[in-house]
């Protein structure tokens, strides 16, 4: 099967979050499974700076963006058997960052038009075209409405993956003519209109042949008013083509037996290296080295979406216990300030690190006993899977991908891979935390068994790849 991915970011070239991880990993797994895979990404200035000497020029042409003719260069490299093509336009993509400009609508309108028009020119007409989030969600619409006259594109099947429904690409209807060069008919009849705006995500949901999300629970949640971001009724209407597939993690990169960022290696049969990493981490972040004290890790953006309003409200109660916490992250200044204040009050129990440090993050995943992740909503989440890979048991709010990946501790069977609570409140966070502490202190054999189950969980991309192939084969025989 010929499969083409079009996305706004993709590791290792450009990455701001989980979308970049998916684009960096899933195509590689599909190639391993025997398929011909290509990816189209914007050619950002950070790509030029880091990878420019590995990328070759292929061709260039002009793209009509409304009444304007814009330069489009095509560049190319091959990595892990995947051919990466880059759309080059320095005006749109040399901004020092991926998102956040006032003209993001124009930038990604150009990108989508250029990606479609590039397919013929690079001689890669896919059987299946996989687009991601609102930045590329207009492509299925454009293929069926603007480019339907191109015979080579007639049989292309499309999949839209929603990584985060909050970001929908809502713009003025004038964009249809001014940038995409199409009429207002589909806006006037309500197809593309939502809340009196042009809504790119709605267009993708309606025009893509299949819609996927990054976990089965999130696929269900976005059809509810609580998580549907005002598109729940549209998603309910299209529910027959909506499904969820849990993202994977790189099992080679996140491997406690070989991880180059760790001082000591270990496996599920011998955790002595984990204990040594714990002592090393405690020393590094300025906490007393205490082997018996439960060490809780947090690696996150400090935002309300991640549940930190509830964490801050619970923190004084938690720190009354014989426990240590190491936090790594940045975000809302109010939460940063709160954690910094608590670290001054409890210097032997809380280490607050308001920064981003890849090595420290990896050490937290590997060395801690418990990993706190009480997100208010979480489409998939990767940190909980990384933590489990290293035998660090997650404590999570049962939502989205957290519900799908963490098996809650069952005290009757002594089974599970972590701890979870359903109602996001200080009471239930504290109650679940107490359950975990009791198990850690008084039932070490059961705790050890949970660690082993967590480390044996399969979150590899090879597993996720099989689910995506089932989805693709439902469209392409």
Curated annotation (Swiss-Prot):
Gene3D superfamilies given in the database record: Glycogen Phosphorylase B
CDD domains: GT5_Glycogen_synthase_DULL1-like
Pathway noted in the entry: Glycan biosynthesis; glycogen biosynthesis
Catalytic activity annotation: [(1->4)-alpha-D-glucosyl](n) + ADP-alpha-D-glucose = [(1->4)-alpha-D-glucosyl](n+1) + ADP + H(+)
Domain of life the protein comes from: Bacteria
EC number(s) reported in the record: 2.4.1.21
Gene Ontology MF terms: alpha-1,4-glucan glucosyltransferase (ADP-glucose donor) activity; alpha-1,4-glucan glucosyltransferase (UDP-glucose donor) activity
Principal EC category: transferase
InterPro entries for this protein: Glyco_trans_1 (IPR001296), GS/SS (IPR011835), Starch_synth_cat_dom (IPR013534)
UniProt KW keywords: Glycogen biosynthesis, Glycosyltransferase, Transferase
Residues binding ADP-alpha-D-glucose: 15
Family: Belongs to the glycosyltransferase 1 family. Bacterial/plant glycogen synthase subfamily.
Function text: Synthesizes alpha-1,4-glucan chains using ADP-glucose.
Name the record gives this protein: Glycogen synthase
């Amino acid at each position: 099967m010929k499969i083409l991915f079009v996305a706004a970011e993709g590791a290792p070239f450009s990455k701001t979050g989980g979308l970049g991880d998916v684009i960096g990993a899933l195509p590689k797994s599909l190639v391993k499974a025997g398929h011909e895979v290509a990816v189209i990404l914007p050619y950002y200035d950070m790509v030029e700076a880091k990878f420019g000497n590995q990328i070759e020029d292929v061709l260039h042409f002009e793209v009509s963006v409304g009444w304007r003719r814009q330069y489009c260069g095509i560049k190319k490299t091959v990595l892990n058997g995947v051919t990466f093509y880059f759309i080059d336009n320095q005006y749109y993509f040399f901004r020092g960052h991926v998102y956040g400009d006032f003209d993001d609508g124009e930038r990604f309108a150009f990108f989508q038009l250029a990606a479609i028009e590039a397919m013929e020119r690079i001689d890669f007409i896919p059987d299946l075209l996989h687009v991601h989030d609102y930045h590329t969600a207009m492509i299925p619409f454009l293929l069926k409405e603007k480019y339907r006259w191109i015979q080579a594109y007639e049989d292309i099947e499309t999949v839209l993956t929603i990584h985060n429904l909050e970001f929908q690409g809502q713009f003025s209807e004038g964009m249809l003519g001014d940038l995409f060069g199409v009429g207002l008919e589909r806006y006037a009849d309500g197809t593309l209109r939502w809340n009196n705006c042009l809504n790119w995500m709605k267009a993708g949901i309606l025009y893509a042949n299949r819609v996927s999300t990054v976990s089965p629970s999130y696929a269900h949640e976005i059809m509810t008013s609580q998580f549907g971001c005002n598109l729940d009724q549209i998603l309910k209407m299209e529910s027959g083509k909506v499904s969820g597939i849990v993202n994977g993690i790189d099992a080679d990169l996140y491997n406690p037996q070989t991880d180059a960022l760790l001082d000591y290696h270990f496996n599920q049969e011998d955790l002595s290296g984990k204990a040594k990493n714990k002592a090393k981490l405690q020393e590094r972040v300025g906490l007393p080295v205490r082997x018996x004290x439960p060490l809780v890790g947090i690696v996150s953006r400090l935002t309300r979406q991640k549940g930190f309003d509830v964490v801050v409200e619970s923190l004084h109660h938690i720190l009354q216990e014989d426990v240590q916490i190491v936090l790594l992250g940045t975000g809302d200044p109010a939460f940063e300030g709160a954690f910094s204040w608590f670290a001054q009050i409890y210097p032997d129990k809380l280490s607050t690190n308001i920064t981003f440090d890849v090595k420290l993050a990896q050490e937290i995943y590997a060395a801690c006993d418990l990993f706190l992740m009480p997100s208010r909503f979480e489409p998939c989440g990767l940190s909980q899977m990384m933590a489990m890979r290293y035998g660090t048991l997650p404590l999570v709010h049962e939502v989205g991908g957290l519900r799908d990946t963490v098996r809650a501790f069952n005290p009757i069977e002594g089974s599970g891979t972590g701890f979870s609570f359903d109602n996001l409140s200080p009471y239930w966070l504290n109650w679940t935390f107490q359950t975990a502490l009791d198990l850690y202190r008084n039932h070490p054999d059961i705790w050890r068994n949970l660690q082993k189950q967590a480390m044996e969980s399969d979150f590899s991309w090879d597993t996720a790849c099989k689910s995506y192939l089932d989805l693709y084969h439902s469209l392409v025989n």
